[in-house]
Each structure stands twice: as C-alpha cells, then as structure tokens.
From Swiss-Prot:
Name used for this protein in its record: Small ribosomal subunit protein uS19
Biological source species: Oryza sativa subsp. japonica
InterPro entries linked to this entry: Ribosomal_uS19 (IPR002222), Ribosomal_uS19_CS (IPR020934), Ribosomal_uS19_euk/arc (IPR005713), Ribosomal_uS19_SF (IPR023575)
Any one GO cellular component localisation term in the record: cytosolic small ribosomal subunit
Cystine crosslinks: none
Family as reported in the entry's similarity comment: Belongs to the universal ribosomal protein uS19 family.
Gene Ontology MF term list: RNA binding; structural constituent of ribosome
One annotated GO biological process: ribosomal small subunit assembly
Ribonucleoprotein as UniProt keyword: yes
Entry keywords, A to Z: Ribonucleoprotein, Ribosomal protein
Amino acid sequence: MADVEVETEVAAGAQPKKRTFRKYSYRGVDLDALLDMSTDDLVQLFPARARRRFQRGLKRKPMALIKKLRKAKKDAPAGEKPEPVRTHLRNMIIVPEMIGSIVGVYNGKTFNQVEIKPEMIGHYLAEFSISYKPVKHGRPGIGATHSSRFIPLK
C-alpha cells in the first residue's frame, strides 16, 4: 500500500510544474473585456478625477496622440514592438487601447521612453517620467554653517 503511494508521488514529481500567470484585471474587469469595452463603460470604472476628465471630452491633442499610437501599432511588424511616439502630453490618462505602445514622455529635458503595460491603466503618463532629480542628502554646501568656513574649497 505504501509502495503504491510512493510511485504515484514520483510519477507526479517527474512532470515539471507549469507556471501560472496571474490574469490582470482592472477593478474586477479582465483585460480582454477592457479592450472590448466602450469608452462610456470604461469611464465608469475610473476614479472621479479621470471620470471628470473624460466627461469634459478629449480635445485635439490627446486624440492626435491616440491616432499616432494606432498608426505606430499598425505599421509595426507582427511580434515586434511599435516605434516610440514622442509627446509632451504628461496629463494624458492611460487607456486600454494604449497597452503595448511605447511613448516618449517629455520631462522638461528629455523624452523618457515608457512601454505601456496593463497595470498603468487609469494613471497619467507623467507618473512614469519623473521631471525632477531626486534629492541626495549628503554633505552640506559652502556657507551652510559657520563651521563650513574651515572646509577647504575643492
């Protein structure tokens, strides 16, 4: 009896475990449904700030960005990443249609390339392109304290 159990465990252990990936869902709606959803239904899932933005309507510039992203995706060969699309529209809200695109988001100095992933839905492009250099707290500068008069200048 014990020998039979050992054999089944060995047989089960011989097969490699298949990796399972978590299916992405935004507020309980899976990605496939999000892509098929109309804009009005999608807006109902967004937080209040994003809902207000969409209710006021997408103006000319955001629509132009979406058209450029569509064109870049269409022109890309199958299985390849699309060409990056540069933009200054840091206040653009990421929608499911943009997933898989590469956007160059301007931070005031350079265009930071951002690949749009499903987890980014509902966020602003600016959140993924930092516009300042984070402070590195270190040694005090010249004139910071009275004792700094005795620090030799470099």
